């Protein structure tokens, strides 16, 4: 059990942010919200993003691939906050939530789902792409993604092109007749973007929050739709709308935006229709199951085995080394770094050491992770004492304060792990190793690698130092 009480729901968090804002020197609600999450150790499992043109709005979202063991104490809030835009200035509880995305579909096999079929379950075709959220606040339309408040600053697969640029390309294909050749070739891109999005939102209802899937040939995750949709394919799929006041889903079976070229997923009458369509198409990403228990709508995703395998083994990031690191951190016995390279990265260019020999990726990553483990463990031992009988620790604050923030963050997380996991002993090196691999994302590892690669004083061997320097360059 944890040694402190988590907030019970989203509104408890909002109320604490408001109370804290009255005494805080910070004027940014996003900063205050993040501090509240850190207070309850809900960050970085839950993330905050600020709106640069509106201090009243904040985006609160979960880290969808975070270790579920670390969110047990606030699992309901974690699940509810897939992506929520909050108005921190409103006095009305009913108006706090500006936009709210449904929970991330839980991956299940058709065999497991078959054990729990209910007659009220609904089935919808799934698309492989990026979620785009569109909503109106204070007479201004906002375009974002589930983890970024501005679609123009969001990207994933493509190394340079943003989802905002891809969205504009889709809209230009839909509304090209509204532009002259002169406008397209000589007008400022921002002016064209504003006109495109104004035309698009003229077809939308301000009282609704919309969810679309951006399907684009330069934003492939798992499926290449070229043979189905044509070379250079790009489209928007309208998958959901919510009432801005009640936050209830709106029925879109009448396909209200199909007249302007927006695509809609197929809805299936039953599980057999959904399954048969999935297995009969080589381009099927699967289907979504919506269940309606007493606790609210829950989504599940069922896909062909080939899609499930790729999603479990290929992170699909543009940087191959991010994928290699991710595979290592999953620590699967049946799928290793060598397997990833043999299947997905046969053309990888391996680093060369000072003797002109290629460096094995598994060796590089394992040496780096082991070094991080040694550094964090030694600093933890130096700064922390723990009494297993009382489940309390003492921290050497003077020594701890001398370390860089990134080190102090991980030491604090280890102390939380020491308490919350109810160890009957002081943390061991293998516990720290598991923490690094299971409780961190690629960004956290990159920050540690960069710190060790650019700073001395951590008693790192020459061999390990070479590996860390190489990985700092490729990550």
Explain the meaning of each model-derived region:
Residues 2-475:
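Core nucleotide-handling region used for phosphoryl-transfer chemistry
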């Amino acid at each position: 059990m944890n040694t402190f009480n988590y907030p019970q729901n989203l509104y408890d968090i909002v109320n604490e942010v408001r109370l804290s804002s009255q005494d805080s020197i910070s004027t940014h609600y996003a900063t205050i919200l993040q501090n509240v999450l850190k207070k309850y150790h809900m960050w970085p499992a839950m993330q905050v993003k600020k709106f640069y043109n509106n201090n009243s709005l904040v985006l609160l979202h979960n880290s969808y691939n975070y270790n579920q063991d670390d969110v047990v104490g606030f699992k309901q809030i974690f699940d509810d906050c897939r992506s929520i835009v909050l108005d921190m200035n409103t006095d009305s509880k009913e108006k706090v939530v500006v936009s709210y995305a449904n929970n991330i579909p839980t991956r299940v096999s058709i065999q497991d789902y078959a054990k729990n079929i209910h007659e009220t379950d609904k089935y919808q075709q799934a698309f492989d792409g990026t979620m785009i959220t569109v909503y109106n606040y204070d007479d201004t339309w906002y375009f974002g993604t589930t983890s970024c408040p501005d679609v123009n600053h969001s990207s994933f697969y493509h190394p340079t092109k943003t989802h905002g640029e891809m969205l504009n390309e889709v809209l230009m294909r839909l509304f090209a007749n509204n532009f002259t050749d002169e406008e397209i070739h000589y007008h400022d891109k921002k002016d064209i973007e504003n006109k495109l999005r104004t035309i698009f939102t003229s077809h939308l209802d301000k009282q609704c929050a919309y969810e679309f899937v951006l399907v684009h040939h330069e934003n492939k995750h798992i499926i290449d739709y070229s043979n189905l949709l044509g070379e250079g394919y790009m489209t928007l799929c309208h998958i959901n709308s919510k009432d801005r006041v009640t936050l209830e889903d709106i029925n879109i079976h009448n396909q209200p935006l199909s007249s302007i070229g927006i695509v809609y997923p197929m809805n299936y009458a039953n599980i057999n229709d959904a399954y048969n369509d999935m297995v009969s198409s080589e381009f099927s990403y699967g289907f979504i199951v919506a269940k309606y228990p007493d606790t609210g709508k829950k989504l599940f995703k069922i896909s062909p085995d080939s899609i499930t395998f790729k999603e479990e083994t290929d992170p699909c990031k543009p940087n191959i080394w991010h994928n290699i690191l991710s595979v290592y951190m999953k620590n699967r016995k049946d799928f290793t770094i060598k397997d990833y390279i043999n299947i997905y990265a046969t053309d990888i260019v391996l680093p060369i050491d000072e003797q002109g020999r290629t460096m094995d990726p598994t060796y590089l990553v394992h040496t780096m992770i082991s070094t991080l483990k040694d550094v964090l463990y030694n600093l933890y031992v130096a700064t922390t004492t723990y009494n297993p009988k009382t489940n309390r620790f003492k921290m050497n604050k003077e020594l701890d304060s001398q370390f860089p923030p990134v080190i102090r963050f991980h030491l604090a997380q280890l102390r939380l792990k020491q308490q919350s996991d109810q160890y009957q002993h002081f943390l061991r090196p293998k516990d720290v190793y598991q923490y690094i691999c299971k409780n961190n994302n690629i960004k956290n590892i990159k920050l540690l690698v960069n710190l060790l690669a650019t700073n001395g004083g951590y008693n790192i061997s020459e061999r390990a130092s070479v590996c860390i320097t190489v990985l700092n360059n490729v990550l």
